[in-house]
């Protein structure tokens, strides 16, 4: 490591730098297919951590089918925009949520984005949302192992683990 970069957080060559957010633990929640309860697990995990006094962010990265706001009854809320940052929607004093659903004029309209647009959205959700100081950031991902899962692992600091949600059917683990 060159002396000028020793001790400085940096991404391996060719990868974008990690987002500069104050979070101790990032936990991603993913599944091999849809409809297995991934968003329910994400919501319950975030709610349980918040109920135990932790500062928690819940990031809904299911860009094509965001439903965390609906599950929490906050689908009519919108994040405030202050200067160049968005304020996440607060469910409680220590549980904040950000989702593409807050930014769409109509959540029934499909979002058809390719890799670079998804990567840019994920970078914005990490860097341009005023998360404050978090103990946990729970990231609800879309089904599969596509761009969102790869991007969040590349961009988020302190990714501590993953919860893989499945059901006891053969097709759920493909």
Please name every model-derived segment:
Residues 25-63:
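Walker A/P-loop phosphate-binding motif and the immediately C-terminal alpha-helix
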Residues 20, 65, 115-123, 146-149, ...:
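Amphipathic alpha-helical transducer elements in NTP-driven molecular machines
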Residues 131, 135-174:
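Conserved catalytic-core segment of NTP-binding enzymes
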Residues 55-108, 112, 119-121, 126:
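Phosphate-binding loop that captures ATP/GTP phosphates
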Residues 34, 61-64, 102-103, 143-144, ...:
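Short, ordered loop/turn segments at secondary-structure junctions
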Residues 1-36, 77:
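Extreme N-terminal, non-catalytic leader segments
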Residues 36-44, 66-69, 144-149, 172-174:
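Short glycine/serine/threonine-rich phosphate/pyrophosphate-binding segments
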Residues 47, 51, 127, 154:
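Short, well-ordered alpha-helices that flank and scaffold nucleotide-derived cofactor binding pockets
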């Amino acid at each position: 490591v060159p002396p000028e970069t020793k001790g400085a957080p940096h991404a391996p060559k060719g990868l974008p730098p990690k987002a500069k957010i104050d979070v101790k633990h990032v936990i991603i929640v993913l599944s091999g297919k849809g409809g297995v309860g991934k968003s329910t697990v994400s919501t319950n995990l975030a709610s349980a951590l918040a109920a135990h006094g932790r500062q928690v962010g819940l990031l809904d990265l299911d860009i094509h089918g965001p439903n965390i706001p609906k599950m929490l009854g906050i689908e009519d809320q919108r994040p405030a925009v202050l200067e160049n940052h968005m304020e996440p929607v607060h469910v409680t004093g220590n549980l904040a949520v950000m989702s593409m659903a807050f930014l769409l004029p109509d959540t029934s309209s499909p979002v058809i984005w390719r890799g670079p647009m998804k990567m840019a959205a994920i970078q914005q959700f990490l860097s341009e949302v005023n998360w404050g100081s978090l103990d946990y950031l729970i990231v609800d991902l879309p089904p599969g192992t596509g761009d969102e899962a790869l991007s969040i692992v590349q961009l988020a600091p302190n990714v501590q683990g993953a919860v893989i949600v499945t059901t006891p059917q053969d097709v759920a683990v493909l």
